[in-house]
Amino acid sequence: MKRVVLSSLLVPALLGFAAGALAQADVPHSRDVKKTNLLDHSNSNLIDSATAKQVLIDNIPAKVWKIQNPGAYAFLSQVEGGLNAQRTCVVTARVMVLPLTGTLNVPMWRPLPKMTATAFDSQPNSSSDGCKAVAKDKLKEATLAIGSGIGKM
């Protein structure tokens, strides 16, 4: 009698779990913003925070979420630079992968970040719009470098 009751409760529970897992399998993890921790500390004259976070979302490959737990790390972007007196645009973009604490879900700066990628460029005779385009492009390049190296963590 106990086996019949146990199996009648266990089978629907397993089917419900399997259906939930299949429903989540259709959602690409790289687009699921709720599962990612994105931080931005960029120069607002070059790129705003929403644009920087969108660049991260669009360029972190789905394989990252298959290899790493999305709730275990935060991605920090930082874009610095600007136009100098000679109208040369100088941009440095950095993306870091920071582990999160287990209890508070806060990024840990120490020990050092798990991974860091930096991309930089300069463009002579540039405008402020051209400099913003370079900043976005360099942030994309640094994000793709993080994505390609994530399997080595």
What residues fall within each predicted segment?
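Repetitive helical segments and hydrophobic/amphipathic motifs
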Residues: 11-12
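Short, Lys/Arg-enriched charge-dense amphipathic segments
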Residues: 45-59, 87-102, 129-137
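Surface-exposed short loop/turn segments
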Residues: 62-108
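Short secondary-structure boundary motifs at beta->alpha junctions and helix caps
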Residues: 102-148
